[in-house]
């Protein structure tokens, strides 16, 4: 399943979202959700403990000036990769 997190991790119930993730799920951070991938942040550490694949949309990082502050443990992807994730995951949940 593809989970897209579009809100800041400080404006949503990230712990509830984490409980709904299953092993092997893809999680894409976009819009203000990219804040969750800041290197050393508590939201990032929580996401990395989950058995998921973590992706961050490059264009949204650039729009917020955060590209250099993102953890190397998160995979930065573009819109083409976003489409591939959507095709690979027929079931999707937007947060």
UniProtKB/Swiss-Prot annotation:
Main location as per UniProt: cytoplasm
tRNA processing is among the record's keywords: yes
GO biological processes: tRNA wobble position uridine thiolation
Pfam families in the cross-refs: DsrH
GO cellular component: sulfurtransferase complex
Coiled coil: none
Keywords: Cytoplasm, tRNA processing
Location of this chain's protein in the cell: Cytoplasm
Superkingdom of origin: Bacteria
Summary of subunit composition and partner proteins: Heterohexamer, formed by a dimer of trimers. The hexameric TusBCD complex contains 2 copies each of TusB, TusC and TusD. The TusBCD complex interacts with TusE.
Entry function: Part of a sulfur-relay system required for 2-thiolation of 5-methylaminomethyl-2-thiouridine (mnm(5)s(2)U) at tRNA wobble positions.
Protein name: Protein TusB
Organism: Erwinia tasmaniensis (strain DSM 17950 / CFBP 7177 / CIP 109463 / NCPPB 4357 / Et1/99)
